[in-house]
Design a protein with these regions (language model features):
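A generic structural signal for well-ordered alpha-helical segments
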Residues: 19, 95-96, 152, 257
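A gly/proline- and charged-residue-enriched helix-loop-helix capping module
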Residues: 68-109
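Aromatic (often tryptophan-rich) hydrophobic motifs at membrane interfaces
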Residues: 49, 86-93, 193-196, 200-302
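Short, basic/glycine-rich phosphate-binding loops at helix/coil junctions
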Residues: 66-74, 169-174
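Active-site/acyl-donor-binding loops of N-acyltransferases
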Residues: 57-61, 117-136, 259-320
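A conserved beta-strand-loop-helix scaffold within acyl/acetyltransferase catalytic domains
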Residues: 2-48, 53-62, 107-241
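Short, high-confidence coil segments that cap the C-terminus of an alpha-helix
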Residues: 39-41, 97-101, 204, 259-262
Length: 320
């Protein structure tokens, strides 16, 4: 039986045990991660935490709605047993009516019929299986990716794991942040706390690229759990655009992890240029479903359209 459980009544030890042992577990769904990223969250729980579904929510005036927090690409149902369309449908049907509106992402394991009325779109992430030897993985690189790596080596760019998360965040703020990326000051604080919490838990790896004159060029935050490494965040300077530092960073990480039972998840992007950059490393597209549920029949469609535009714009800019 699936029941609705308010945050204060969630057994967090059982919750995280479920995520630990889920066939589709992801670090996004751990209680500590949700506590740091979501304004508030409740949950749907099946039986004794056999399967769970987080419900991050906000309240605006009279309306309580489910939303997708920043720094979380996928949520949905996480289960200790094999998932199918019926399970996903049952969880969606169990979302209480007090949530008058919902717009959130499932994960790549959550299946639904193509004609399901709640499907509001499809998101894409890019994944690369690192189980193969480095030489084999390198063969999947595009010509442009190879050129960028060669350029970085010629310019004597070097990679290290020594550095501070603040350097990566600052590079993003000073470059992408100045181009209208809709990050509030709170978002940057949350990101910093997420990284340090992940480091404390042994889930975060940082990689930095420096120029031949020892100037910071680029950095990446990798989150690892459940045999998957997610490229959660990156930042780069204008110099990195000219010296191929970001390509070298990713190539270095692929070489480091090649032959291991790991999948590198680039976290996808709605930006065509960035998606092309990720595909340049031989990654493949993986689709996850976006769910939109409107239980407010008199909610004006223009308002919904405006909300969707803002959400998509934020997603594109965040992943850029």
């Amino acid at each position: 039986m699936i029941r609705y459980v308010r945050h204060d009544n969630i057994n967090f030890a059982k919750w995280d045990h479920c995520i630990d042992h889920s066939v589709n577990g992801m670090f996004y769904a751990y209680a500590w991660y949700l506590d740091m990223t979501a304004d508030s969250w409740d949950a749907l729980v099946e039986d004794d935490y056999r399967a769970v579904m987080p419900l991050p929510f906000r309240k605006k005036a009279w309306m309580k709605y489910v939303y997708q927090p920043f720094f979380i690409q996928q949520l949905g149902v996480f289960s200790t047993y094999r998932l199918n369309e019926e399970v996903t449908e049952h969880f969606l049907e169990a979302i209480p009516r007090e949530f008058r509106f919902a717009d959130f992402n499932l994960n790549t394991y959550n299946l639904l019929s193509d004609r399901h009325p709640s499907i509001g779109g499809r998101g894409v992430t890019h994944e690369l299986d690192l189980i193969f030897p480095y030489g084999h993985l390198q063969e999947g690189y595009s010509a442009n990716t190879r050129r960028n790596i060669k350029k970085a080596r010629a310019k004597e760019v070097f990679v290290t794991n020594a550095g501070r998360p603040e350097d990566i965040i600052l590079a993003f703020r000073q470059n992408r942040g100045k181009l209208g990326v809709p990050f509030a000051e709170k978002d940057y604080r949350v990101l910093k706390h997420l990284i340090y919490a992940g480091m404390h838990k042994g889930m975060v790896s940082l990689r930095f690229a420096y120029s031949s004159t020892n100037d910071f060029c680029a950095g990446i935050v990798f989150f690892r759990s459940h045999h998957k490494v997610v490229l959660l965040f990156s930042g780069s300077t204008p110099e990195a655009r000219n010296n191929g530092a970001m390509s070298l960073l990713i190539d270095h990480f692929i070489q480091e992890c090649a032959g291991k039972e790991l999948v590198l998840d680039f976290e996808g992007s709605a930006d065509p240029g960035l998606a092309r950059f990720y595909r340049g490393f031989g990654s493949e597209e993986c689709v996850f479903l976006r769910i939109i549920m409107n239980k407010v029949p008199f909610l004006p469609e223009p308002l919904l359209d405006g909300y969707r535009w803002i959400k998509n714009h934020c997603k594109q800019q965040k992943n850029a």
